[in-house]
Curated annotation (Swiss-Prot):
This is Actin cytoskeleton-regulatory complex protein PAN1. Residues 566-601, 713-746, 787-879, 965-997 form a coiled coil. It is a peripheral membrane protein. Component of the PAN1 actin cytoskeleton-regulatory complex required for the internalization of endosomes during actin-coupled endocytosis. The complex links the site of endocytosis to the cell membrane-associated actin cytoskeleton. Mediates uptake of external molecules and vacuolar degradation of plasma membrane proteins. Plays a role in the proper organization of the cell membrane-associated actin cytoskeleton and promotes its destabilization. Residues 126-161, 426-449, 460-495 form the EF-hand domain. It comes from Eremothecium gossypii (strain ATCC 10895 / CBS 109.51 / FGSC 9923 / NRRL Y-1056) (Yeast). GO terms for cellular component: actin cortical patch; actin cytoskeleton-regulatory complex; cytoplasm; endosome membrane; nucleus; plasma membrane. Residues 1150-1161, 1239-1248 have a biased composition (Pro residues). Disulfide bonds: none annotated.
């Protein structure tokens, strides 16, 4: 890089302090910045002088020198810079650098020269060494000139160094690629501009002022007040040219001298603009000495370097610029010199010198410590059309383009951190998702209420939120779209992270929609006629012009000194060369592109391998144990939570009930005269009104009638109402306090359960954690990473689900195993229990069988003993009651074959035995005795009555010698009930069979009446038992059918003979008639139903057979109305057996007995006539039924074999069953009961 500060002119630079003191301080702090922006600190800021000469106003100071010339030149709008965005620059910085570049690039060129760039870069205040390093980095093609991207890069590096950064030793690859791409794009677009005119050969902005003009044209800069001199000062002479027109440089106030400063020549040919802040290099490489420009006591002023003067010019004499008596030194200018110009200072009024007093508005002094001289006025040439002659000059900017970009403040703080701020894609994705969440209507606009509520959650104060809203709501619509909302959220996060909020929204944060809208607005504001040629080429509309001549890289160092050749002058060879050059360039670009692609592909493959390895490592990591709460604990927690709510609801209801109960209790304790009709008996307003009306009515009635009525007055009602209201308020206050206590308890329980709920169901604040949103939800990550996270979570979820399923399956299997084990244990216990019960049942059954056997054995023994005892008693009674005739016949009746029989054997027993010959004996004995009418004497009958009373007494229960266990005692009742049921069934079945047998016997007897049983056969032994059951004649029925004879003793039957007792012959009448008073009384009692026996018994043996009627053959056999009261049931005599021709016997059907006839008392009247015998069925007469004398003991007929004809059903039996309540008593007489003693009853009247 060409560096003029490293040449031999260093001493002048160092003494001057240009690079360190003069320029650096002028640029960075006071001199230069204050010279252009405000007045220097060394001058006295006095008010502008006012002049009274005419109506003209004083001229204001204007910018002078090179800056003025650059400002007048403007921007190079012909330069075509492609539309390309540099990522390392903000949009605002790139626009500023483009403006500066356009102002410095010469017309027709696309690059900025090193000399022009040096002047720009030196204003930064950096050292030449630093600037040299920056130039080396920016000049990528080593052309000595910079294109716009290279110039922008240089400005960016300068800005970084000013902000404290280091100069990089090499450019970043990304920055380098962007700059190279931008440079290539510019190179392809070169040649689109038209060539410059033929005669234009400008190289610098100053050439237009020095070339093409012989002499400088006069320029009016103001009015001169009338003075004694009145001649303006000549400001320049040309070589061989007419003097320059006088130039007015200011107004002169009237003085006592009345003459102004004379005109002096101040320069040679083409005097250039004076630099007031810097020096231009002289052609010889040396600088001019300082020119004395001050008055008395004033220091030298730096007025700038002057352009190179042509050789041969006459030297200009120096001009006095100070006060009176002070001679200014001549300023050497090399070969030629210029006369110093009057630029200010206090001028002494002197006619000899002709000095001109300065304007009062000019700075008039220097402060101590200032190294910069007085501020010079503009002395250069200004375009004559800039202002009117009567208007004052306006202050102009003195820098290139926008002068404020070069101020220290601009370089130091003109690039705030917010300029580089922009929204990242991750932030956009996150903020857009939040916007879509709240934009439920899908309108694309978020209302200010919703957006303000979202912003308020950040915790910023109101002023900051208002400032953020003003920044993001660019169009003041009160609503935010997606981009504006994202900008607002971005500013909120930056403020939370400690960054300051910008005063204006940076261009990088301006939403694209707002930028487009603003551009459209600006285009609409500008008319179509004033539109300029577009400064950028649209990439879509770009079309390469191959006919244009493009500069090569080798001639970029050169400038176009000659006009470009016309298209017509191009030859075919030149075009071929251009085509070949383009082809080579394309090939090189392709090769470089392929190399870059290969390198990028290798890097991508390596990156992918690394990513795959990381993914594999992540997948291979052991999964975190699922710390989920067991399902039973979770279910328990849920149940407790729900039960707590239920409990609180119940408590609230109970509290309400308690409150109502208290109110009701108060009303009961303090009864009111007002009857409430509201809910729960509450007193309503209507009830109160009604009570008041009632009280008023009662008071009026009392006043009318004069009688007091005891009714509560209105005051009493109000007092009661007030008391009730106070009590109700008190009760409600207590209820409210209780409710508050319950609410506190509920809140405490909620606080305790909240951590548990968070642990079970996860945290509810996880969405506020950016890391959670990033790595759990995948917000702000690349799509591949998001997919990987999603798949990883799915894998973890599946693994957890499988683990939970396995755990549940194991728990289910364990539960089933426990259930099976429990079932097996229960089954085993049940089997053991059943076995034990069966064993107990068998033991009980065996014990019961043994007990039954023992009981039967004991009962049999007792029965035998009782039968023997009864037999003995009967024998004894018969023996005592035997008549002398019987004693006389006793030896005759004795059978020689039975010598061992005692006197107790009676004919009655023989008759009974004879009657039972044909009945098979089953070993059953029927206890009982004869009837009362069987005894003739009173003593025998009294003995009979005593015997029957003794028999009626219950026998002592048999004592069991075996101790029963508790279980036998428990089953005793059940066993007895079962036995009773079985006995009833057997009884019904036996009765049914007996009825069937009776029916069959009656049928057989009616069919074969010829065969009858002869009474003579009773003494004989039966040949064989008959298949047809033969019912024996009951002694009771026999006694009922027999009437006592008058004039004879007790009837006596001889079983072996029938000669005297034939039923077919008339019986002999006794001479005397006996009447038994007791027998008649007994008969009468039986007829009247006064007997104690009811004919029912629980004995199965006695009640199993139906009572059969006794067949009678004579009228004398009148049956009794009932059986003996001591007997369980009257035993009917069996029908008379009829012997058939085939040897079988038929039973005669029973004959209905006639009603009993009372016997008259003993008298000597005629005997009672006996009716003839009743006719038998089918014209046959049954044989006479033998009369059996009553005996003391009558054996019960044996059970006959039952005929089973297949009908086992006993439900249709019409036989009355014994009630279950009637239980048989063990030990009682199962056969007969004794008749109690009967008091003496007078005999009935005799029969007619």
């Amino acid at each position: 890089m060409y560096n003029p500060y490293q040449q031999s002119g260093g001493p002048a630079y160092g003494a001057d302090g240009y690079g360190q003191q003069g320029y650096g301080q002028a640029y960075g702090q006071q001199g230069f910045g204050q010279a252009y922006g405000q007045q220097g600190g060394g001058y006295e800021a006095g008010p502008a002088a006012t002049y009274t000469a005419g109506a003209a106003q004083p001229l204001r100071p204007t910018a002078t020198g090179f800056v003025n010339a650059a400002a007048s030149r403007g921007l190079n709008t012909e330069l075509k810079i492609p539309l390309f965005r540099l990522s390392f620059l903000t949009a605002a910085d790139q626009a500023k650098f483009e403006t500066l570049f356009r102002s410095a690039v010469r017309p027709g060129a696309t690059t900025i020269t090193g000399e022009d760039c040096k002047h720009i870069l030196l204003r930064s205040g950096l050292s030449p060494f630093q600037l040299g390093l920056i130039w080396t980095l920016c000049d990528t093609n080593n052309a000595g000139e910079l294109l716009f991207p290279e110039f922008a890069l240089a400005m960016h590096l300068v800005n970084g160094v000013l902000q404290g950064e280091r100069i990089p030793r090499a450019l970043d690859s990304k920055v380098k690629n962007e700059v190279s791409s931008f440079v290539d794009l510019i190179n392809f677009s070169v040649g689109s501009n038209s060539p410059p005119p033929e005669g234009q050969k400008a190289r610098t902005p100053f050439d237009a002022l020095t070339q093409g003009a012989g002499t400088l044209q006069p320029q009016a800069t103001g009015f001169m007040p009338p003075t004694s001199f009145g001649v303006p000062q000549a400001t320049g002479l040309g070589f061989g040219q007419a003097p320059m027109q006088p130039q007015a440089t200011g107004y002169m106030p009237p003085t006592s001298f009345g003459a102004g400063l004379g005109a002096h020549t101040t320069g040679g040919n083409a005097l250039a603009s004076q630099m007031t802040g810097g020096l231009q290099q002289y052609a010889g490489g040396a600088f001019q000495n300082y020119q004395a420009t001050g008055g008395k006591g004033l220091g030298a002023q730096v007025t700038g370097g002057f352009a190179q003067q042509p050789a041969g010019a006459n030297p200009l004499l120096s001009q006095l610029t100070g006060g009176q008596g002070f001679q200014q030194q001549r300023q050497p200018t090399g070969a030629n010199s210029l006369m110093p110009q009057v630029t200010g200072g206090f001028q002494q009024p002197s006619n000899a010198i002709g000095s001109q007093p300065p304007a009062m508005g000019m700075p008039q002094g220097l402060s101590q410590g200032q190294s910069v001289g007085l501020q010079a006025q503009a002395t250069g040439f200004l375009p004559p059309s800039q202002f009117a002659p009567t208007a004052p000059l306006a202050a102009q900017k003195t820098g290139f383009g926008n002068n404020e970009i070069y101020s220290h403040a601009a370089f130091a703080s003109g690039f705030p951190a917010g300029e580089d701020d922009k929204l990242t894609p991750e932030e956009k994705s996150l903020f857009y998702n939040i916007f879509d969440t709240y934009d439920t209507d899908k309108t694309g606009q978020l209302h200010f209420k919703v957006a303000a509520e979202i912003f308020r959650k950040s915790g910023l104060n109101r002023s900051e939120l208002e400032r953020i809203w003003n920044l993001c709501d660019t169009n003041n619509s009160g609503q935010l779209n997606r981009q504006e909302f994202a900008v607002g959220m971005h500013l909120i996060y930056r403020r939370i992270n400690g960054h300051n909020l910008p005063h204006t929204l940076p261009p990088s944060l301006v939403p694209s929609s707002t930028r487009i809208l603003n551009n459209v607005k600006n285009q609409l504001k500008v008319s179509s006629s004033s539109k300029k040629e577009p400064t950028r080429i649209d990439g879509l509309a770009y079309k390469n012009n191959d006919d244009d001549i493009l500069p090569s890289f080798k001639n970029r160092r050169k400038t176009f000194t000659e006009p470009r050749q016309s298209k017509d002058n191009k030859t075919v060879d030149d075009l071929k060369k251009l085509v070949e050059e383009k082809r080579r360039k394309l090939e090189s670009e392709r090769s470089q592109l392929s190399l870059r692609q290969k390198d990028q592909q290798i890097k991508d493959e390596e990156t992918m391998r690394h990513v795959d390895s990381l993914m594999h490592q992540i997948r291979s990591l052991p999964m975190k144990k699922h710390a989920a709460v067991p399902s039973d604990m979770k279910a328990r927690f849920d149940s407790l939570t729900s039960s707590i709510s239920t409990l609180f609801n119940n408590i609230a209801e109970i509290d309400d009930e308690i409150t109502n109960a208290k109110v009701h209790l108060y009303r009961l304790k303090n009864p009111s005269s007002i009857v409430g009709s509201g809910p729960n008996g509450e007193v309503t307003e209507y009830d109160q009104k009604k009570a008041r009306q009632k009280a008023v009515l009662a008071a009026r009635m009392a006043a009318l009638t004069g009688t007091p009525i005891e009714t509560p007055s209105e005051a009493d009602l109000r007092r009661e109402e007030q008391g009730l209201n106070e009590e109700v308020a008190k009760i409600k206050e207590e209820s409210r306090k209780n409710q508050e206590i319950l609410n506190d308890i509920k809140s405490s329980i909620t606080e305790i359960s909240a951590p548990i709920s968070t642990f079970i169901y996860g945290s509810g604040n996880a969405d506020k954690d950016p890391a959670y949103e990033r790595w759990e939800l995948g917000i702000g990550l690349e799509p591949e990473v998001c997919d990987f996270i999603r798949k990883l979570k799915e894998t973890q979820t599946q693994a957890q689900a499988q683990e939970q399923a396995r755990a549940q399956e194991q728990a289910r299997a364990q539960e089933q195993a426990r259930a099976q084990e429990k079932a097996r244990a229960q089954e085993k216990a049940r089997a053991q229990e059943q076995a034990r019960v069966q064993e107990q049942a068998r033991a009980q059954e065996q014990a019961r069988a043994q007990e039954q056997a023992r009981a039967q054995e004991q009962a049999r023994a007792q029965e035998q003993a009782r039968a023997q005892e009864q037999a003995k008693a009967d024998a004894a009674s018969r023996e005592s009651t035997r008549s002398p005739e019987e004693f006389a016949r006793w030896p005759q009746d004795q059978s020689p074959s039975h010598p061992g029989l005692t006197a107790s054997v009676s004919p009655q027993s023989q008759s009974v035995s004879v009657s039972n010959r044909g009945t098979p004996q089953l070993g059953q004995q029927q206890m009982g005795s004869g009837f009362y009418s069987d005894y003739q004497s009173a003593d025998a009958r009294a003995a009979y009555v005593r015997q029957q009373s003794q028999l009626k007494q219950p026998a002592p229960a048999p004592t069991s010698t075996t101790d029963f266990n508790s279980e036998d005692e428990e089953d005793e009742e059940e066993r007895s009930l079962r036995e009773q049921l079985a006995a009833l069934k057997l009884k019904r079945k036996a009765e049914k069979e007996a009825k069937l047998a009776v029916g069959r016997n009656q049928t057989g007897a009616s069919q074969d009446p010829a065969v009858r049983a002869s009474p003579d056969e009773w003494d004989e032994q039966p040949s064989r038992p008959s298949h047809t059951p033969v019912y024996s004649t009951s002694p009771a029925m026999a006694s009922q059918g027999e009437l006592p004879k008058q004039g004879s003793s007790a009837p006596h039957l001889h079983p072996t003979t029938t000669g005297d007792r034939s039923p077919f012959f008339k019986q002999k009448q006794g001479s005397t008639s006996t009447f038994d008073l007791k027998a008649a009384e007994q008969q009468r009692r039986l007829q009247r139903g006064l007997d104690d026996g009811d004919g029912w018994s629980d004995d199965e043996d006695s009640s199993s057979k139906p009572t059969q009627p006794t067949a009678t053959t004579s009228a004398t056999d009148i049956p009794s109305s009932g059986a003996d009261s001591g007997a369980r049931a009257p035993v009917s005599a069996a029908p008379a057996s009829i012997v058939r021709p085939d040897g079988s016997t038929a039973t005669q059907p029973p004959v209905v007995p006639s009603p009993p006839v009372p016997q008259p008392g003993p008298s000597s009247g005629a005997p009672i006539p006996i009716a003839p015998p009743l006719p038998t069925l089918n014209g046959q007469q049954a044989g006479p039924a033998p009369s059996v004398a009553p005996t003391g003991h009558v054996e019960r007929a044996a059970s006959q074999p039952q005929i089973n004809d297949g009908n086992e059903d006993d439900e249709d039996s019409d036989v009355l069953s014994i009630p279950e309540s009637v239980e048989s008593e063990d030990g009682k007489d199962q056969y007969t009961t004794a008749i109690p003693e009967i008091p003496y009853i007078p005999p009935p009247p005799p029969l007619p």
